[in-house]
């Protein structure tokens, strides 16, 4: 059983508390035997700790002198809280393959992969250790998923992209897509997303990318490491998204555009030309409005 003392020591503090830890609570409604965090130290913070001795608080450095057996001061309380929840409260769930999923005999799934109900994993798909394929996910032939990656319910990866060429009679002829999709390690893809496979070369989602629900990523797109793409965004074909980029909700990026490292695209922006590194753009069409400092 996890206790306050174990968590406090893991965060660099010292405690002999015997209180057990069973869950989480907010700082506005603290509950016994839970962990909470304070973003800022205010004049009321010390009283909050004193009145709730059975709640474990993670506080900013300004609260170090007032910490008690139920508190620990760290540089980044929100990050420390996230690590405590991950490492002490959530834990690793056992890998399970739903009997109601379709998994091709030629698919390669590591032993620690989990697959939910009614998921479809087609021929030749590769999924790395620790990854979770949620209910109703479809992974088409040509998809490779790295380790410790999670794909949310009702997401389709590797479907054919939207590309046509007109014949001599002016009729649209679909261009076959055979490039597949490469998804890196520690990627999170939300529910109801669609990621199209590349035409010839793969669509690529790099390590540690975080994609929210209801995002569309077209064929041949490249998304760099540590980038965030938020709900409702649309990335058109052959666009390049750099490292540490933030694409806000409902933003759209035109085909073949390049978004530089560290850039931020504002809510509902329509990007019709390249965006330089660490530039903030917003509006329709998107225009530079500021500078985003490197992290």
Where do the language-model regions lie?
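Structural signal for interior beta-strand "rungs" in well-ordered beta-sheet cores
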Residues: 37, 96-282, 286-289
């Amino acid at each position: 059983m996890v206790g306050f003392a174990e968590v406090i020591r893991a965060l660099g503090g010292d405690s002999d508390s015997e209180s057990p830890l069973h869950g989480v609570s907010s700082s506005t409604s603290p509950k016994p035997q839970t962990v909470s965090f304070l973003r800022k130290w205010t004049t009321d913070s010390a009283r909050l700790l004193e009145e709730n001795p059975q709640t474990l608080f993670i506080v900013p450095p300004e609260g170090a002198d007032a910490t008690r057996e139920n508190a620990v001061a760290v540089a980044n309380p929100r990050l420390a809280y996230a690590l405590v929840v991950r490492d002490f409260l959530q834990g690793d769930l056992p890998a399970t393959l739903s009997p109601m999923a379709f998994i091709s005999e030629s698919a390669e799934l590591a032993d620690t992969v989990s697959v939910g109900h009614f998921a479809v994993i087609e021929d030749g798909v590769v999924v790395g250790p620790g990854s979770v394929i949620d209910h109703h996910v479809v992974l088409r032939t040509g998809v490779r998923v790295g380790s410790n990656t999670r794909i949310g319910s009702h997401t389709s990866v590797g479907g054919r992209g939207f590309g046509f060429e007109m014949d001599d009679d002016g009729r649209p002829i679909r261009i076959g897509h055979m490039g597949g999709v490469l998804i890196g390690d520690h990627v999170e893809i939300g529910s109801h997303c669609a990621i199209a496979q590349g035409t010839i070369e793969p669509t690529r989602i790099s390590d540690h990318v975080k994609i929210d629900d209801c995002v569309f990523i077209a064929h041949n797109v490249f998304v760099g490491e540590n980038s965030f793409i938020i709900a409702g965004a649309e990335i058109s074909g052959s666009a390049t998204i750099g490292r540490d980029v933030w694409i806000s909700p409902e933003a759209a990026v035109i085909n073949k555009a390049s978004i530089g490292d560290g850039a931020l695209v504002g809510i509902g922006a329509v990007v019709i030309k390249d965006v330089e590194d660490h530039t903030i753009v917003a509006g329709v069409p998107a225009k530079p409005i500021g500078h985003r400092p490197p992290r």
